[in-house]
Structure formats: structure tokens, C-alpha cells
Amino acid sequence: MEIRRDKYLDLLIHSCGNGLIKVITGMRRCGKSYLLFTLFKNYLIKQGVKEDHIIGVNLENRLNKSLRDPDALLQYIDSRLSSDGQYYVMLDEVQMVSEFEDVLNSFLSISNVDVFVTGSNAKFLSKDVITEFRGRGDEIHVRPLTFREVADFRDDYSQDMIREYMLYGGLPQVVLENDVNKKVSYLEQQMEHTYLRDIKERYEVRQDSDWSELVDIMASCVGGLTNPPKIADTFKSVKHSSISVDTIRLYLEYMEDAFVLERVTRYDIKGRKYIDSPFKYYFEDLGLRNARLGFRQVEPTHMMENMLYNELRAIGMKVDVGQVFTEVKIEDGSRQRKTLEIDFVCNRGYERVYIQSAYAMETEEKRDQELASLRKLRDGFRRIVIVNGLQPTYMNEEGVYIINLMDFLRAPEKYMEERL
């Protein structure tokens, strides 16, 4: 039984013949190669494309080390273009080729060649798609499996499945593995020996202790507001380290460029402006985050918030942290400015939805706390609170949708539409 990745497969299918280089980005081991070399290749063959017209090269494979030379790669592919008809060139981990931008641009002038490449590092790909391909690159960003993709594969939409997903995440190899000990071992090995080592080697990180401590700090503060100066203060007071703010900023960028972390900016909703700092950071895969901390600190409130962030990004939403400023009366009768937070301000085109993540709303005080910021909004956009447990989905008397977590995970797009 295969894991379906229909959204990404459809994007690849619709991109065929558009005259652009299709650049499939995403963290390592998230399923890019499977998408391109199995799902998409099988689709092409079913459409009648001959196998000798599909030229695939895995550049991570040591057997293809010689093809990491740009001239050798060009010569190899050119030798395979032996007849008329449409050819499909698929290059896996293309950033391993020196001057790969020039190689890819060389194919743009060949009308019967459609090029698809994968890469695992944003510095080498996402930013270069814009600068190097001069508007002729089409990026498709692949994320780890969503909850729905995992639940569909397992045929299991249960509370236990939610808990398992929040613990082990959505890397395909983890989902395919049934043995818990092997899941844990795989995640720990990948986090340490694939993601973090890859970053250290690529950017020549020398301060091993500070680097390791920073990764731990970021794993511990998921969903919390922070910034490089605050982290530097933590190093100084707790770790007795003098690591600079600039070094911390660089290290965070390295993790973002490897698609391990995503940074989320605060947005002043009433003032309609972005607030520079602090930020929130979320992990693209919760299993990697939990593995880094030895599967300790698995606090469900923050795990649910991180999971929802990933689900929203997977359906194409741009996500900010919302800020609403209000005044409250204090004991001496004076008024004091207070900042209220909205977990997710979700934008896609002209659509906007405000979302609060609430693991539980068991008391009136907790309910008021979750609704307080949403009550201050009067712009007509949808307001949602997503709640874990058996809470039924309904709209309250204030026009706020209270949505059960499982209902949302089954069909997130449905709840982001203009009308339910």
C-alpha cells in the first residue's frame, strides 16, 4: 500500500510543459524522491511515456559521484536524448552539483525536455530559484506527511492516532515503521546525523557546545516568543557563554534554510503592520523536535499548536502571530495597555482566518482567555477556536466557530473557506 501525496502529485502534473524548471524543495527524508521517482514516474508511464524518455539521476548516490561535475552531468543527459518526443529529466538532490544553476539553465532552451529537480537546502534552492533562474523556476515545497495523510494511510482517525502523530511526526519512514523503538531510534539518528550534522558541515559550525545548546533551546521553546538577543541573555546567565547575537541569528538561519525550523512574525492587526521582534519558531516535523529532547517535554498544548501550524502551512496558508492591543482597568482605577495574542493569522490571497489553538477549555476562565483576543476583532473575517477532545463543532452566540480538533484535521480546507 502506497502513501498518497495527491496534492503534490497534482502540482507536478499541472506543471508539465510550462517551460519552467520544477524545483521540489523540502527537508531531507520528507518524501521528495518518492514523490518524483515513484509517484510521478508511475503517472508518466501510465500516460504512455516510454521509460527511456524518463532520465533520472540520484546525485546523493555515491555511484553517481562523477555526475556531480556539471560538465559530466550535461554530457550524460545529452547522450540519453537520442530521439524525438518529450523527455523528462529528474535530478535528485541537485544542490550536490557544483554550478547547478548553469546546468539547469542549459535545459531551458531545449523545447522537448521538461526538468524536475529536488533539493534539501533553501540557501541553495529557494532563494536561487528567484535570482538564478530569472523567473523560469517553479518551486514546489514538500512538507512531511500531514495528519490526514497519515490517518488515511493507516485508516485510523482516532485520538490515539493524534497523540501518536504529535509524538512521532510525519516523516514517511517513521509512519511506515510499526515498532516504537525503531521509530525513536530512526528519529534520533536522523536529527543528529542527517539534519544537524549536515548543517554543521555545510556551514562549518565550530562552536559545537553552543550550537548543540541552541538546538535544545529552540526545541524547548516551541510556540513561545523569542529572538536572538533573548537567547543570548539565556546563554550568558544560564550557560555562562558569550555567544554573540549575530552568531545566534546565523545559526537560526541555518536551521530555517535546512527546513528544520520556520520563523513566524508578529502582526499588529488593528495597526496593520508587522512587528519586527520577537518571533515564534515551529518545527516542520514534531518527531524530530521530540527526538532532540529525548521525548521529554512533550507538552500537549505546544505540540497541538505546532501541529496546527504545520497543517495550515500544508494547505498553502501564510501564517503570522496576531497581536491586538487593548486597555484594561487595574486596581487603582487607572487604565493599562495590554497585549492579546491570536495564535494564527492565516492569509491566502484575499482570504483571512483568525485561529486560536486550545488544547482544552474546561473552565469559564479558560474559555474567556481563548476568546478575549477574538472578541476585539471587528473586520468580518472568520474567527475560530480549535479544541482537542470530544468537544462538538459549533458556532457560538458571538459568531466564533468552536471546532473539534479531529474535525479540523479531517478537512482543514473546509474550515478555511468563506462559507461552511
Where are these regions (language model features)?
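A cross-kingdom feature that marks ATP-driven nucleic-acid transaction machinery
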Residues: 2, 34, 45, 49, ...
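Structural recognition of the conserved hydrophobic beta-strand(s) that form the central parallel beta-sheet
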Residues: 114-120, 141
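Interdomain hinge/linker elements that couple catalytic modules in large macromolecular machines
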Residues: 2, 148-325, 337
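Conserved glycine(s) of the Walker
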Residues: 31
